[in-house]
Amino acid sequence: MSEEVVESSSQEASQVIPQEQEDWADDVVTTMPAQEVTEWPEIKLFGRWACDDISISDISLQDYIAVKEKFARYLPHSAGRYAAKRFRKAQCPIVERLTSGLMMKGRSNGKKLLACRIVKHAFEIIHLLTSENPLQVTVNAIVNSGPREDSTRIGRAGTVRRQAVDVSPLRRVNQAIWLICTGAREAAFRNIKTVAECLADELINAAKGSSNSYAIKKKDELERVAKSNR
């Protein structure tokens, strides 16, 4: 009895399905036109600072300070992808290199989120004080803080002397970032000012070429010693 019921129900279903298929075939399917993306949304650092109008005054550093559109990021964090190969850090966004420089010394080692907050706060302070794009101020500070000439030790026949040498563009950027971060860290030690405020002051003074900047003073000292060892 149950088998007869199953067979009859299957026959009824087989008669209904073709009828439904015919009804569906008559329906007109409307599709939405595909939307074309005419232009990509602009990527701004921290959602505020654009990088399309940044200019680098020193032509020798244009390939080593990455601030163009293809290096734009919302946050200065790339999970170390530029550390896999030698000299690839030249393509690392310059703000991320500045953020990583703040993580030096034991007390700040590995605290990337804290360093990002410091840079974000410092950029807001720079914008309030100068009414300029903080990215442009940072680039100007790095260009002005990198020493063009340094001295090295040369030994011959047991005598050691110092010889003036030219500094490569990548090392100029490396030393500029290190001097700026060191100056901000030392200024904030045992001071009522926060690290973000000291970093903003250091970047503004370095961008102006002022002697109040730790990086500018150290750069002038290195170049003066190198000049005496020519």
UniProtKB/Swiss-Prot annotation:
Q: What SUPFAM superfamilies does this protein's entry cite?
A: Ribosomal protein S7
Does Ribonucleoprotein appear among the keywords? Answer: yes
Q: Where is this region: Disordered?
A: 1-22
One Gene Ontology BP term is: ribosomal small subunit assembly
Family matches, as InterPro entries: Ribosomal_uS7, Ribosomal_uS7_CS, Ribosomal_uS7_dom, Ribosomal_uS7_dom_sf, Ribosomal_uS7_euk/arc
Asked whether the keyword Protease is assigned, the reply is no
> According to the UniProt entry, which residue ranges have a biased composition of type Low complexity?
7-16
Q: Which UniProt keywords apply?
A: Ribonucleoprotein, Ribosomal protein
- Kindly list the GO molecular function terms attached to this UniProt entry: mRNA binding; rRNA binding; structural constituent of ribosome
- Name any GO cellular component annotation: ribosome
NCBIfam families per record: PRK04027.1, uS7_euk_arch
Tell me the protein family, please: Belongs to the universal ribosomal protein uS7 family.
**The name this protein goes by in its record:** Small ribosomal subunit protein uS7B
Q: Which organism is it from?
A: Drosophila melanogaster (Fruit fly)
